[in-house]
Design a protein with these regions (language model features):
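Signal-transmission coiled-coil "S-helix" linker that connects upstream sensory/regulatory modules
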Residues: 1, 8, 12-15, 33
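Conserved nucleotide-binding and Mg2+-coordinating catalytic segments in signaling enzymes
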Residues: 15-34, 55-69, 77
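Short regulatory alpha-helical coupling segments
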Residues: 15-16, 29-49, 80-88, 107
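Cell-envelope/extracellular polymer assembly enzymes that use nucleotide-activated donors
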Residues: 51, 143
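Catalytic-core segments of nucleotide cyclases and related cyclic-nucleotide turnover enzymes
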Residues: 69, 111-119, 136, 149-185
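Alpha-helical scaffold within the catalytic cores of cyclic-nucleotide enzymes
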Residues: 80-84, 113-131, 163-165
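A short pre-motif secondary-structure segment
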Residues: 93-96
Length: 185
C-alpha cells in the first residue's frame, strides 16, 4: 500500500513537471494547447465565447543584453506571477507560450471582458516597476493582443491563436506598451 502511494505521488509529480514551465512555474505551452483544446470544445457545446490574450515583454532581448540572463530570468518570473495574479478566475489558464511570450485563456469571456483583464495585467506589470534603461519607457512593459470567438465546427482553436497573435503584432507595430484587439475587417 505504501509503495502504491509512493508511485501515485511520483506519477502526480511527473504530470506536474510535464505541464509546467520550469523557470516560471506557470503552465507550459504543451499544457496551454491541451487546455485551449478542452475549453474550445466545452465552449462550443455551451455556445460560449472564449478569449485569448497573447502577451509579450517589450524589448526583452535588450533587457537580457543590458542586465544579463539571470536578471532576465527573474524578470520572466515576476511578469509570469503578475499575469497570474491579475487573471483571477480559477477557469483562467496562464501559460508561458515561449521565450518572453505568455498566453491567457479566458473561458466564457467576450472581447469586452478580455479588454478589462488585459488592462489589469498591463497595469500590474507597470506597478512592478522593473527598471529597463534600454526601453524608451524606462521600465519593463507588456504588449497584449486579444481575440475572442464563439467556437464553431468550422473554426479550430488555432484560429484564435492566430487572431490574438495578429493583434499582438499590431500592438508592437503601434508603439508597444499597449493592448490591441483583433478585428476581422
Amino acid at each position: 500500500l505504501s509503495l502504491t502511494r509512493k508511485l501515485d505521488a511520483a506519477n502526480q509529480e511527473l504530470i506536474r513537471i510535464s505541464s509546467s514551465d520550469s523557470l516560471t512555474g506557470i503552465a507550459n505551452r504543451r499544457y496551454f494547447e491541451e487546455a485551449l483544446s478542452i475549453e474550445w470544445r466545452r465552449a462550443r457545446r455551451h455556445s460560449n465565447p472564449v478569449a485569448l490574450l497573447m502577451c509579450d515583454i517589450d524589448f526583452f532581448k535588450l533587457f537580457n543584453d543590458t542586465y544579463g540572463h539571470l536578471a532576465g530570468d527573474d524578470c520572466l518570473r515576476r511578469v509570469a506571477h503578475a499575469i497570474s495574479r491579475h487573471s483571477e478566475r480559477p477557469s483562467d489558464t496562464v501559460a508561458r507560450f515561449g521565450g518572453e511570450n505568455f498566453a491567457v485563456i479566458l473561458a466564457e469571456t467576450s472581447i469586452g471582458g478580455a479588454l478589462m483583464v488585459a488592462e489589469k495585467i498591463r497595469h500590474g506589470i507597470g506597478e512592478l516597476g522593473i527598471p529597463h534603461v534600454s526601453s524608451p519607457f524606462g521600465q519593463v512593459t507588456l504588449s497584449i493582443g486579444i481575440a475572442s470567438a464563439a467556437p464553431g465546427f468550422d473554426n479550430p482553436p488555432d484560429d484564435l491563436i492566430l487572431a490574438a497573435n495578429k493583434a499582438l503584432y499590431r500592438a508592437k507595430q503601434e508603439g508597444r506598451d499597449r493592448i490591441c484587439r483583433f478585428d476581422a475587417a
